[in-house]
């Protein structure tokens, strides 16, 4: 997604510490309700993280995909104009064409995919405000500024990948050899995921085991079940026969050895010493241990070989030539009882208005952009279009002279987490041991920090990502080659990352947003309960074309 000194300001450091300590309480120090907690997660971390939280709280479900779309009955020459060649728009067009509709797509960009987007070496991207970046990555290297992983249960996306022969490979979400980092813990030195994972589980298991032995659970657990519980804690926490988590064989096989077993005369291993329970707890590094346990992040996860944009390109191939008109900026959407008229201009030759007409329209333009375009819809839908905020997010892709994370750190895929504004370093899950340069995701930023980073120039975002990342990987400064950054509020075709529904906004406006308003219907990730995911975009398209087809059948086809 998109080398010098740039230290975090005292204000940034203070904000990060305050965010860590106050997140679970309101301004009065009172614990938050589930609804309040989800709202705060959405505002500070984004809708994708809020959806993960909803999953863990039992408030979200897997994809509702049940199989290929089946539109029964002939549309009798009905025409549909689709606005936007993202996955929602192309999925709608593909299925409608199969059912016999005449379909045309108007797309702002010179390529298909929308937010299904990869920046490859040699690409040029110009953001709002005019800043232009030419990606200096080597050939075949890329970054995904938008979606970058596909859960195994996102069946609609995966079904199209299979149908269109888009090759997939595993995306490594959890790597026990990656790092967890907090500037306020362990002298600012990063710790391996496995060390924090093993020591946290070990200490918690020991505390619970001792409480059980002392009778603290007598009222909650029978004596027989207490013995089973102790056995499970010994296994889960790598406790010794005395139910203690201490330096020894049991703990070292989980957290790693000080000296690993080898061969020959000097092959005897040396056990490592666990960190103290108070240090583990106060570090708060345990907060990211469960990231891979969330339903959306559980293995197996996938990515297309060669970049996420391979899916968008495959859709465009299947649609065939002439269906998508690129470089088309929509300036007005009108409708009457006979059909829809869309006014647009060619972005390569602006100033001359063009029009496209159809019986029906499926609009996948994000509300963040659509709210700036005259649209003839009813008052309720018009209000819904203007009320949905879009999340701020920034991604920074960094190319290095060598894959030092593999060569020096033995990190192959996965994610390191930090309390620094960059939040995330994600290592490539492909081309292991390949010679030459490599690209990693050097920052994935949400919330207020994302607004801050978006306000900087692309070059400054890259510099900050390198400076912050060097606190985790000192090799950064010597090995850095070039970078590219994308602040989603500066992306011309979205003006934000994704639709950030809250429970209150959904209750008030979601129903209106999903209705077919005369001859115009909406689709996209923002018209779904799987925000920010490609699955939500495709499922919204499937839903709306099913309802639209029923309406067409009821009215006899073409206008």
Language-model features: locations:
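N-terminal glycine-rich phosphate/pyrophosphate-binding loop and immediately adjacent elements
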Residues: 66-209
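A glycine-rich dinucleotide-binding beta-alpha-beta segment and adjacent secondary-structure elements
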Residues: 476-527
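C-terminal lid/capping helical subdomain adjacent to the catalytic/cofactor pocket in oxidative enzymes
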Residues: 507-559
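C-terminal segments that line or cap access tunnels to active or ligand-binding sites in enzymes
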Residues: 289-296, 358-360, 367-494
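N-terminal secretory signal peptides
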Residues: 1-33
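N-terminal export signals
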Residues: 22, 30, 35-62
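Active-site/ligand-binding neighborhood in enzyme catalytic cores
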Residues: 177, 184, 208-329, 337-339, ...
């Amino acid at each position: 997604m998109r080398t010098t000194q740039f230290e975090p300001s005292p204000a940034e450091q203070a904000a990060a510490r305050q965010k860590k300590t106050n997140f679970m309480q309101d301004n009065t120090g009172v614990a938050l309700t589930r609804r309040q907690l989800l709202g705060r997660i959405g505002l500070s971390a984004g809708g994708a993280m809020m959806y993960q939280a909803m999953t863990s709280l039992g408030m979200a479900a897997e994809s509702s995909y049940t199989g290929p779309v089946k539109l029964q009955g002939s549309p009798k020459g009905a025409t549909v104009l689709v606005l936007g060649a993202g996955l929602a728009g192309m999925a709608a067009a593909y299925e409608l064409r199969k059912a016999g509709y005449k379909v045309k797509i108007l797309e702002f960009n010179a390529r298909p995919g929308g937010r299904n987007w990869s920046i490859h070496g040699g690409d040029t991207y110009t953001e709002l405000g005019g800043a232009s970046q030419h990606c200096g990555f080597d050939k075949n290297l890329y970054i995904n500024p938008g979606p970058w992983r596909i859960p195994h249960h996102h069946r609609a996306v995966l079904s199209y990948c299979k149908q269109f022969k888009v090759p997939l490979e595993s995306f490594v979400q959890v790597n026990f050899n990656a790092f967890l980092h907090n500037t306020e813990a362990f002298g600012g030195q990063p710790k391996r995921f496995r060390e924090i994972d093993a020591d946290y589980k070990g200490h918690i298991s020991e505390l619970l085991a001792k409480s059980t032995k002392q009778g603290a659970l007598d009222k909650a657990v029978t004596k027989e079940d207490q013995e089973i519980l102790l056995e499970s804690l010994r296994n889960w926490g790598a406790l010794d026969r005395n139910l203690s988590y201490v330096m020894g064989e049991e703990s070292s096989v989980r957290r790693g050895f000080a000296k690993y077993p080898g061969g020959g005369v000097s092959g005897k291993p040396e056990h490592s010493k666990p960190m103290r329970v108070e240090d583990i707890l106060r570090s708060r590094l345990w907060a990211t241990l469960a990231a891979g346990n969330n339903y959306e992040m559980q293995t197996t996860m996938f990515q297309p070989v060669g970049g996420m944009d391979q899916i968008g390109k495959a859709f465009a191939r299947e649609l065939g030539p002439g269906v998508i008109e690129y470089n088309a900026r929509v300036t007005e959407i009108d409708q009457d009882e006979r059909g829809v008229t869309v006014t647009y201009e060619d972005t390569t030759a602006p100033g001359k208005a063009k029009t496209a007409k159809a019986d029906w329209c499926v609009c996948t333009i994000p509300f963040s952009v659509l709210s700036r375009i005259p649209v003839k819809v009813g008052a309720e839908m018009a209000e819904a279009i203007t009320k949905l905020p879009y999340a701020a997010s920034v991604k920074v892709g960094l190319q290095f002279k060598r894959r030092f994370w593999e060569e020096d750190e033995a990190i192959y895929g996965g994610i390191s987490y930090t309390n620094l504004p960059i939040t995330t370093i994600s290592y490539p899950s492909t081309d292991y041991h390949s010679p030459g340069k490599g690209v990693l995701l050097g920052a994935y930023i949400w919330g207020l920090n994302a607004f801050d980073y978006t306000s900087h120039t692309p070059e400054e975002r890259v510099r900050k990502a390198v400076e912050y990342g060097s606190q985790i990987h000192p090799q950064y400064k010597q090995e850095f080659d070039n970078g590219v950054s994308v602040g989603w509020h500066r992306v011309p075709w979205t003006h934000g990352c994704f639709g950030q529904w809250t429970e209150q906004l959904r209750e008030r406006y979601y129903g209106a947003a999903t209705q077919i308003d005369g001859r115009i219907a909406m689709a996209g990730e923002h018209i779904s309960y799987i925000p920010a995911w490609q699955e939500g975009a495709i499922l919204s398209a499937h839903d709306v074309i099913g309802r639209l087809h029923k309406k067409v059948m009821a009215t006899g086809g073409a206008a």
